[in-house]
């Protein structure tokens, strides 16, 4: 299965006990199975596993939010360009950048009762969908569409629905 090429930059705070590159690659493959526009090796994504300070600074600069967030996505292509990228046989096109915050990811994983690996996998899928032009902040229908794609991608990896409401 084709998926975007991932260029990884991993801050030491993430540690080396876990193969983060493998986790991101598997997440990209699953995302490409549910969002075919991502199923192309001529798309390039920069994935940065950063500390909270770096994500905080970027979130403040680009979104005017003075706090870290779990994942930031910076698309380089419009939705239309993503859809047409598959036809381009040339050099890889830059789909965009994705940055995950270690501390936020770790805290959220603990709150959800899942491993950091599981939550990071979800965030990579989520970020890739943003880079492909999906946006849950545009409205309820868009949020539902994006969440359904996330659920399907995660299910392919044996990961439970992150949006399930527990009683």
UniProtKB/Swiss-Prot annotation:
Similarity comment text for this entry: Belongs to the endoribonuclease YbeY family.
Which cofactors, by name?
Zn(2+)
Write out the GO MF terms: metalloendopeptidase activity; RNA endonuclease activity; zinc ion binding
Q: What is its EC number?
A: 3.1.-.-
Provide the alphabetized UniProt keywords. Cytoplasm, Endonuclease, Hydrolase, Metal-binding, Nuclease, Ribosome biogenesis, rRNA processing, Zinc
Cofactor: record remark: Binds 1 zinc ion.
Q: Which Pfam families match?
A: YbeY
Q: At which positions is Zn(2+) bound?
A: 126, 130, 136
Q: Cite a GO CC annotation.
A: cytoplasm
Give its localization.
Cytoplasm
The record's top EC class is: hydrolase
**Name of the molecule in the record:** Endoribonuclease YbeY
Main localization is: cytoplasm
Extract the HAMAP family matched here. Answer: Endoribonucl_YbeY
Q: Which domain of life is it from?
A: Bacteria
Q: Tell me which InterPro entries the record gives.
A: MetalPrtase_cat_dom_sf_prd, YbeY, YbeY_CS
Q: Which GO terms describe its biological process?
A: rRNA processing
Q: What is the role of this chain?
A: Single strand-specific metallo-endoribonuclease involved in late-stage 70S ribosome quality control and in maturation of the 3' terminus of the 16S rRNA.
């Amino acid at each position: 299965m084709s998926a975007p090429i991932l260029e990884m930059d991993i801050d030491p705070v993430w540690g080396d006990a876990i193969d983060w590159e493998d986790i991101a690659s598997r997440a990209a493959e699953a995302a490409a199975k549910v969002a075919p526009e991502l199923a192309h090796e001529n798309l390039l994504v920069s994935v940065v596993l950063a500390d909270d300070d770096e994500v905080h600074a970027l979130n403040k600069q680009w979104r005017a939010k003075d706090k870290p967030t779990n994942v930031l996505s910076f698309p380089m292509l419009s939705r239309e360009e993503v859809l047409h990228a598959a036809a381009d046989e040339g050099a890889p096109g830059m789909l965009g950048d994705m940055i995950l915050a270690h501390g936020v990811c770790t805290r959220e994983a603990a709150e959800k009762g899942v491993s950091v690996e599981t939550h990071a996998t979800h965030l990579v899928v989520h970020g890739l969908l943003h880079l492909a032009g999906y946006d849950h902040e545009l409205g309820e229908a868009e949020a539902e569409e994006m969440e359904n794609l996330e659920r399907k991608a995660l299910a392919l990896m044996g990961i439970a629905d992150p949006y399930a409401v527990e009683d």
